[in-house]
Design a protein with these regions (language model features):
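Short, contiguous alpha-helical
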Residues: 8-20, 24-71, 111-157
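Helix-adjacent hinge/juxtasegments
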Residues: 62-102
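A mid-sequence interfacial segment
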Residues: 90-125
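Basic/polar N-terminal segments that are highly enriched at the extreme N-terminus
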Residues: 1-5
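A non-catalytic, amphipathic alpha-helix used as a structural packing/dimerization or gating element
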Residues: 6-17, 81-85, 89
Length: 157
């Protein structure tokens, strides 16, 4: 059985590979509207960080997530700082999780408008898969640009 914290660590490791690849692109290529879910490579990357930030607020009953818009991130340094802030929050939360904490229940309204009971583990798995889905989108866009995406397989498989 995989510990959800291992999935979080994996996502962080792979996220850095993608950040490094995106950092090599000219800014106009990074921000170009490619008619994808959040239009540009930059926006998709920011969205995945925003999802982590949002769900950490939910799990921790905080209101610390950024209110910045995509265009407020004008440099790779801006992206790196946001990524670092979100990752510190996630690492701190994950390190504090006890076996009981992973099973803590919350009520959330799902995308169908239905109130649903979920555990912290459910939320963390959702955060993991949300980023993986959008990583697939980044892969497709990089391929369309003729760029080989970074390795992303679990344990380099």
């Amino acid at each position: 059985m995989v510990d959800v914290r291992k999935l979080i660590e994996y996502n962080e490791e792979v996220r850095h590979r993608y950040f490094d690849s995106l950092a090599k692109l000219p800014w106009d290529e990074l921000t170009k509207n490619r008619e994808a879910s959040f239009h540009s490579l930059r926006n998709i990357f920011i969205h995945t960080l925003g999802a982590v930030d949002y769900w950490l607020d939910f799990l921790l009953n905080e209101k610390l997530r950024t209110k910045r818009e995509f265009d407020d991130y004008g440099t790779m340094d801006d992206l790196q700082k946001y990524m670092a802030r979100v990752e510190v929050r996630m690492r701190t939360y994950a390190a504090s999780l006890t076996p009981e904490g992973v099973l803590k229940e919350y009520e959330v309204t799902n995308d169908l408008g239905v109130a649903t009971r979920v555990t912290a583990e459910d939320v963390l798995i959702h955060v993991f898969e949300e980023e993986v889905h959008h990583r697939g989108e980044l892969i497709a866009l990089l391929w369309q640009m003729g760029i080989e995406p970074p390795l992303m397989g679990w344990k380099y498989l």
